[in-house]
């Protein structure tokens, strides 16, 4: 998260929300740390969650989508894409979801 955009309290709140989100997705330990550590990642994860909630009303379905293979990502699930490509992978997932919402 770029500190110039947000104050310390906002950064802390976003990080906590992203950590809770990742836990709801069933991601733990090193994988959760990998998703959360780095500038811009909490905001990207929250953007992904927002987009998924626009598409799916059921939070269990959201968690299943994150871990399901997706042809749009070459058969890789969104979670693996985000773990492998970091922030760039998160941005790709978010862009895909936003395009799905817009279509």
Protein language model regions, located:
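Non-transmembrane "mature" sequence context
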Residues: 1-103
């Amino acid at each position: 998260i770029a500190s110039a955009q947000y104050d310390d309290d906002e950064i802390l709140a976003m990080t906590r929300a992203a950590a809770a989100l990742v836990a709801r997705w069933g991601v733990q330990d090193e994988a959760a740390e990998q998703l959360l550590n780095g500038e811009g990642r909490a905001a990207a994860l929250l953007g992904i969650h927002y987009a998924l909630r626009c598409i799916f009303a059921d939070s269990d379905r959201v968690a299943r989508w994150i871990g399901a293979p997706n042809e749009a990502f070459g058969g890789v699930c969104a979670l693996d894409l985000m773990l492998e490509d970091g922030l760039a992978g998160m941005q790709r997932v978010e862009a895909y979801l936003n395009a799905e919402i817009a279509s």
